[in-house]
Amino acid sequence: MTTRVPAPLLALAAMVSVQLGAAIAKTRFDEVGSVGAATLRLVIGALVLALVVRPRVRHWTRAQWTAAVLLGLALGGMNVFIYVAFATIPIGVAVTIEFLGPLVLSLAHTRRWRDVSWAVLALAGVVLLGVGPTAVTAVAGVAAAVAAAVCWAGYIVMNQRVGAAIPGIDGLALSMVVAMLVSLPFGLHSAVAGVVDDPTLLLVFAGVALLSSVLPYALEMAALRRMVTRVFGVLQSLGPAIAALAGLLVLREALSVQEVVALACVTAASIGVTLSGRRRRAVP
């Protein structure tokens, strides 16, 4: 079925699915709290993935275990911190700040002065967010989004190592279990209390886990089989804009003009770095 759909549309659908799941999860923060929501998503996602994949870990080496555990720590931190950020700042702003993680990681590997312009553009976006009304009134949320950005950068690095060290998606399945364990001490109580009061929350967060984890992974995997990674990277750069749109439609979170300009700066810088990086790798 997915072979009939253009690959770029699959990649865009994956991003829309992720941000829609996040927006839906935020609508239930009053019942389970932000960390409780992250915990429910991770628990359901980890259990489903573990049951489907059934990772064969018996003969793993110490290096394979280390890589998978470190990936899980990064994944757990990324999910918990970004949900904490969602609780106090708009989703569009939080995802824009979080997106600085992979952007800075890309810039750290550059050796060309031309790419400095993209760093300056991204810095302009950071400054605009830093002096905007959201940053002034919700310092904790901004700090949580920055922590999520750091975890996202770590997730990218460790995901590459896990992919190289462990065949298939067995490493990802175990990493999801580790991420779940990371969240349990902080969100188990509020998650259980919310579910006891309203058992239908299990269905809601099963949908969130599907939208935020299972479906995007399947769509991205199908897209990457039929498109070059340069185009995929450019499309991924639209994440902050899609997050802002999801926040507006689902949560009525309107961004200020200053925040929209900041979002545009970070998105443009990410696209520029992606295109520049792919061109460099194409040169013999």
Across the structure, where does each feature detected by a protein language model lie?
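Glycine-/small-residue-enriched transmembrane alpha-helix faces in small-molecule transporters
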Residues: 1-36, 73, 77-81, 124, ...
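Hydrophobic transmembrane alpha-helices of multi-pass small-molecule transport proteins
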Residues: 100, 114-133, 246-248, 258-277
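Transmembrane alpha-helical segments that form core, pore/gating elements
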Residues: 49, 105-106, 133-191, 205, ...
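Specific transmembrane alpha-helical segments of multi-pass solute transporters/efflux pumps
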Residues: 17, 50-94, 126-128, 209-227
